[in-house]
Amino acid sequence: MLFKKIKVTPKGVYVLDAELRNKIDKLKLSPSMIGNWLNSPADFILDKFIKPDVEVADVTHLKRGNWFHSTMEVFFGLPAEERTKENLLKVSKEVTLREDYRDFARDKENQEWYKRALKAYIGAWLPDAQKERIATLYIMGQSKPGLELFVNGKLGNAKRQCLGFIDKLIEGENGLKVQDWKTGKKISNYDPNLKISTSNPFDYWRQQTFYAMLLEQLGGTVEEASLLFPCAETPTIVHVDHQNPKVREQVIKDVEQVDRELDEAIKNDYFFPFKKGPYNSWASYLVGLGRAPKPNIREDKFAMLADLSEVGGKA
């Protein structure tokens, strides 16, 4: 048998490959990493380190989101008085001609999605664009504008670095406003009075509170944290109660839990357990946990990387 990178068991996945183990040793904690790990450690590992080599690429939703994000980053990089409809359309053409999006933009469905997203933004929030002042932060000896702003630090007692990119940071009357674009149709919100669940997801609140806490470490005062959904049926801004002590405690708890569980997995010979969940496609596909859709992969390529002898010999 050729050397395999991973071994799949009914309970989880062992990482065998030394290079992958080294990458896992160096993992840092971001909001998306934390959310994915809490859903299923094995699914997180497979998605991050194995799927890129075996997937049948279907990047439509991700690429559409990046296209819109890139447009907004350039648009809000303009001086406030130049943030007009005409200039937004000009920026959109410039971004679309980038190598990242040029071929993707030729698809009619993608074109229509992009037009709808821009139209929704223009109708809902363009009038505010000329009033918004993009914040400037002094980080690591440099002044940096609050667009796709990289922040890092430590939270709670976690040993690993906490980091991420903030889409947009603007000046409020009494501090900073942390904003994040969400380009899906579904509005996701959280009720802090109810238990975290699939129907009451904490991911987006965790993300914005996580960023607010890192900004506070850098000396910032965060006035507001929010999520902007331009592609929802009605464009909506969801405000996150980032100052709620229970919300902040939950963020710290999640950060520390993932940091601790990652240590335990490494000590346990790089073993990562499966968990059942509606989006845990690997757990469902490989060991029959739940009914999540099958991952879009080349099974022959996956079988070359994975020892599947304990789960029936083949996926």
Q: Which residues does each PLM region occupy?
A:
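A non-catalytic, helix-rich entry segment at domain boundaries
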Residues: 67-149
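Metal-dependent nuclease catalytic regions and adjoining charged, substrate-binding loops involved
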Residues: 205, 212-315
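Short acidic (Asp/Glu) and glycine-rich catalytic loops that position anionic groups and cofactors
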Residues: 45-51, 182-187, 228-239
